[in-house]
Amino acid sequence: MDYCGRECTILRRLLDEDVTYKKIKLEIETCHNLSKHIDRRGNNALHCYVSNKCDTDIKIVRLLLSRGVERLRRNNEGLTPLGAYSKHRHVKYQIVHLLISSYSNSSNELKSNINDFDLYSYMSSDNIDLRLLKYLIVDKRIRPSKNTNYAINGLGLVDIYVTTPNPRPEVLLWLLKSECYSTGYVFRTCMYDSDMCKNSLHYYILSHRESQSLSKDVIKCLIDNNVSIHGRDEGGSLPIQYYWSCSTIDIEIVKLLIKDVDTCRVYDDISQPYIRGVLADYLNKRFRVTPYNVDMEIVNLLIEGRHTLIDVMRSITSYDSREYNHYIIDNILKRFRQQDESIVQAMLINYLHYGDMVSIPIVRCMLDNGATMDKTTDNNYPLHDYFVNNNLVDVNVVRFIVENNGHMAVNHVSNNGRLCMYGLILSRFNNCGYHCYETILIDVFDILSKYMDDIDMIDNENKTLLYYAVDVNNIQFAKRLLEYGANVNATSLSIINTAIQKSSYRRENKTKLVDLLLSYHPTLETMIDAFNRDIRYLYPEPLLACIRYALILDDDFPSKVKYDISGRHKELKRYRADINRMKNAYISGVSMFDILFKRSKRHRLRYAKNPTFINFVSNIKWYKKELTSIITETVKNGERIDSIVDNINTDDNLISKLPMEIQREILYYSIK
């Protein structure tokens, strides 16, 4: 065998794209041992010529065969000349026939090289011969060899063919009808809607959307032959969603691709933070090309079929609010209003309940089209539904709702019997990790508080806002409620009892919540009620803080409650010893106990600069925290009043003419 150690002239000439029969005939006829000439890649003369990009001349092939060049020679890639020729861009039926050879193997079995022809490669060529397809598939029942490239591109014959520049419907139809033949070739990689992979429609649209050469005949042929318009790719997109990325949209093609499709259905894109769907993608600039254009005729077509109002709402508001096409949204709402004004009201409710980013202009557009904020749907006002939205609540949206007659919801329980703010509190503030939202919650409360008839309103479970704030251990919100007048002594459910349980779950400053509540002086009855219930706690500090407070109210407190405090005899002994110290220490004939716990803050202010009062805490061990807080507050208030008096006396005014002691007395009454 004559392997070319240097470039073999005849083989190199056969690879030239300008080679012709006239030019090469003499060289072939005069070449010595042409059948022995092999290049470094293992190609013989036939390999070289049929791999040439030129228009293959059957006369040259016949001439090479007549000179003994082997049809069955395999090159380094394992390909015979037939296998190499099947990758040509313009395969000819007659040449394939010439290159096919039958032979007997070592077992004397009749074999053929027919399976070397790579149908996958052939289907990607520009010129498909239907006769050749029928010959290979029907007559010869061709099967893929190990050298076919299906494993590389992963596509079936139909999938490959539709990606060619100009697939012909008649070829496509024949391929689709030939799936029944047992050849071993894959015709379509995605056969069923449940496969969740691109089907032939996806590939056709994807490969032709830039060239704008989509054919209605090809699309119709695919659809009519069981290529499903309902098939979804790996990300969940339908063929019609691929079509939206074309710069020109043909409504007739749209009609073909959406028949019986739920065009308003939406889903979450797992690869990116977007809500996707047929209508949603059509309206979203992100999934369209420039120039962005929305045809209301197509929009109407998309919302004519079956749909739910939730899906319609999510479709038209699924994208970035900075890119909303308000004109289109307004037209869609007008269309529904013409059918029934209650539809727009339902869309408002659904938008507030499910919208991933509620936009005030969209809400205003819904109001302009007949929706209202003061109408209930299933016993819920719109504000109720907004507060159960799983996405972040926008303070500005809340303000817009209540300022547009949505404030009525504030004094009504929702359809599940809960307070208006219940969903807002529970959905995001049910563990310490969400306390970054406290500012939003407090800002929302500040807006709603102006409309509240009763801050201690109870829901169907006899729970108040303060109870819920304590239940979710939201100290800042509880503090704001107390500042606005919420009653720590609410009798419906024990707030103190709940605080003991929830406070003990905090890793740091375990008594902060109960300290806040106790600073608002719950009554003895409230404390008794708390300890008459089942008490649960993880750490004892909140419980002990409440016991200390209750003993100040009544030394005999332990005997008046069901909860067994007597087991903590050591703590009780210590607390009572501190109380006795306070009762036996006097200033101006008044016991420290009375000054600290019985008299008013105004009375206590008189002792703000008294060293005995200020230093008293040093002799107290178990009530040190409580006394330090009281004395610090008293001194701070005293300094505040002194500062006010100093400022008053810098000007000539009526109060400045009064003696300073009287000025202070007047200011004392400003302290509760």
UniProtKB/Swiss-Prot annotation:
<dbReference type="Pfam" id="PF09372">
    <property type="entry name" value="PRANC"/>
</dbReference>
<keyword id="KW-0040">ANK repeat</keyword>
<dbReference type="InterPro" id="IPR051637">
    <property type="entry name" value="Ank_repeat_dom-contain_49"/>
</dbReference>
<feature type="repeat" description="ANK 4">
    <location>
        <begin position="235"/>
        <end position="266"/>
    </location>
</feature>
<dbReference type="InterPro" id="IPR036770">
    <property type="entry name" value="Ankyrin_rpt-contain_sf"/>
</dbReference>
<dbReference type="InterPro" id="IPR018272">
    <property type="entry name" value="PRANC_domain"/>
</dbReference>
<feature type="repeat" description="ANK 2">
    <location>
        <begin position="77"/>
        <end position="108"/>
    </location>
</feature>
<feature type="repeat" description="ANK 5">
    <location>
        <begin position="282"/>
        <end position="312"/>
    </location>
</feature>
<feature type="repeat" description="ANK 6">
    <location>
        <begin position="344"/>
        <end position="375"/>
    </location>
</feature>
<feature type="repeat" description="ANK 3">
    <location>
        <begin position="196"/>
        <end position="231"/>
    </location>
</feature>
<dbReference type="InterPro" id="IPR002110">
    <property type="entry name" value="Ankyrin_rpt"/>
</dbReference>
<feature type="repeat" description="ANK 8">
    <location>
        <begin position="461"/>
        <end position="490"/>
    </location>
</feature>
<protein>
    <recommendedName>
        <fullName>Ankyrin repeat protein D4L/I2R</fullName>
    </recommendedName>
</protein>
<dbReference type="Pfam" id="PF00023">
    <property type="entry name" value="Ank"/>
</dbReference>
<feature type="repeat" description="ANK 7">
    <location>
        <begin position="378"/>
        <end position="410"/>
    </location>
</feature>
<keyword id="KW-0677">Repeat</keyword>
<feature type="repeat" description="ANK 1">
    <location>
        <begin position="41"/>
        <end position="74"/>
    </location>
</feature>
